[in-house]
Amino acid sequence: MAKLHDYYKSDVVNELAKQFGYKTIMQVPRIEKITLNMGVGEAISDKKLLENAAADMAAISGQKPLITKARKSVAGFKIREGYPIGCKVTLRGERMWEFLERLICISVPRIRDFRGLNAKAFDGRGNYSMGVREQIIFPEIDYDKVDRVRGLDITITTSANTDEEGRALLAAFNFPFRK
């Protein structure tokens, strides 16, 4: 079991229950899933780029990504409905906790010119979204084998009802929020 999951069960649950006055531990917010998304717009002209992006995503997440397809045709972007234009991975359970641990402890500190994550990137329902400009911050990606530097979106979906609860949950995991 991931250390972060043990820490959540032993310390964070009690801390948040006390802070927000929950009657049962089932009311305490928890992380439900982490979604990684990589849009590869250049895949229209070169299919190899999407394969490389999917391989990077598989290395980062530890599971095979789902290839996302265009929902409708857009002439301005030269895409048709059904064209593969990106990939995504949804992490739950043990893989989710392991990824979150790697993200907080290893990857986020490796971001260039890092001054903390934006504390206002919550969606109003306690879910947090962040963008990463370079996939090379993850230790699983070998810098020499990267064909192109790509970014990805990371969404942490929680069971929190408000942004305040979600922020308290992530802050309990020592998320490096900007002051």
Swiss-Prot record:
Purpose of the protein: This is one of the proteins that bind and probably mediate the attachment of the 5S RNA into the large ribosomal subunit, where it forms part of the central protuberance. In the 70S ribosome it contacts protein S13 of the 30S subunit (bridge B1b), connecting the 2 subunits; this bridge is implicated in subunit movement. Contacts the P site tRNA; the 5S rRNA and some of its associated proteins might help stabilize positioning of ribosome-bound tRNAs.
From what superkingdom does this record's organism come?
Bacteria
Q: Which UniProt keywords apply?
A: Ribonucleoprotein, Ribosomal protein, RNA-binding, rRNA-binding, tRNA-binding
Q: Which GO terms describe its cellular component?
A: ribonucleoprotein complex; ribosome
Pfam families with a match to the protein in the record: Ribosomal_L5, Ribosomal_L5_C
What organism does the record attribute this protein to? Aeromonas salmonicida (strain A449)
Q: Show the Gene3D superfamilies listed in the entry.
A: 3.30.1440.10
Q: Which InterPro entries match?
A: Ribosomal_uL5, Ribosomal_uL5_bac-type, Ribosomal_uL5_C, Ribosomal_uL5_CS, Ribosomal_uL5_dom_sf, Ribosomal_uL5_N
Q: HAMAP family of this UniProt entry? A: Ribosomal_uL5_B (MF_01333_B)
How would you summarize the oligomeric state and partners of this protein? Part of the 50S ribosomal subunit; part of the 5S rRNA/L5/L18/L25 subcomplex. Contacts the 5S rRNA and the P site tRNA. Forms a bridge to the 30S subunit in the 70S ribosome.
Molecular-function GO term, any one? tRNA binding
> Biological process GO annotation list?
translation
Name of the protein in its database record: Large ribosomal subunit protein uL5
